[in-house]
Amino acid sequence: MDMQSRIRRLFEASIETKQQAMDILAPHIEQASLVMVNALLNEGKMLACGNGGSAGDAQHFSSELLNRFERERPSLPAIALTTDSSTLTSIANDYSYNEVFSKQIRALGQPGDVLLAISTSGNSANVIQAIQAAHDREMIVVALTGRDGGGMASLLLPEDVEIRVPSTVTARIQEVHLLAIHCLCDLIDSQLFGSEE
C-alpha cells in the first residue's frame, strides 16, 4: 500500500469511529457539560489528569477554560494536574507514581469541584487513584475512557459521567477524546455566556 492510500485509510478509520461514537456519546457529553457548568456556577473548579497523550488532553482542556475556546470571555478555573514536574517527580520519588494525581487532588480538590479523568484503557493506576481521591473530596468525576471502560468504569458513582469511546484502537480513542473535549468547551461556553449562533 502506498503512503497516500494509507493516509486515506487512517482518515476513514477516524471518521468512521467518530460517526459510530456520535449518537452513543452525545447524551454523555451533554450530561458532563451540565455537571461542569453547575460546578462553575457554584464557584467550583475543574481538575484534569491523564498520562501521555491523555496528559496532553488534560492540559488542552484546562488551557481552553483558563484562556478561551472560540470566543472572548472571562477565564474559567481549571488546573491540569500533569504540568508541575517538581510536584510530579517528588511524589513519584517519595511515594509512588500511582499517587502523582491523588495527592494533588487531596490538596486542591473541594466538594463540588469536577475531576476530568482521562485514560484510553480506563486502567491507568494513577488515574484510578485520582478518582478515589476525588470521591473522598466529594467531587464529581467525568471520565473519558475507551475499550470496556476498565477499572475506572467500576469506580464511578451515579452522579459521575463516563464518556466511553466505542473503540479498541488507542489512536482512534484519543481522536474522539479530543473532539469530546472541544464539545465540552463549546457547551460550557454556550451555557454560561449564550450561544453565538
Swiss-Prot record:
Q: Which residues bind substrate?
A: 51-53, 64, 93-94, 119-121, 124, 174
Q: Is Iron-sulfur among the key words of this record?
A: no
Alphabetically list the UniProt keywords: Carbohydrate metabolism, Cytoplasm, Isomerase, Metal-binding, Zinc
What enzyme category does the UniProt record give? isomerase
One annotated GO molecular function is: D-sedoheptulose 7-phosphate isomerase activity
Residues the record lists as binding Zn(2+): 60, 64, 174, 182
Pfam families tied to this protein: SIS_2
Query: Subunit arrangement?
Result: Homotetramer.
Q: What else is known?
A: The reaction produces a racemic mixture of D-glycero-alpha-D-manno-heptose 7-phosphate and D-glycero-beta-D-manno-heptose 7-phosphate.
Protein's UniProt name:
Phosphoheptose isomerase
Q: Which organism is it from?
A: Pseudomonas putida (strain ATCC 700007 / DSM 6899 / JCM 31910 / BCRC 17059 / LMG 24140 / F1)
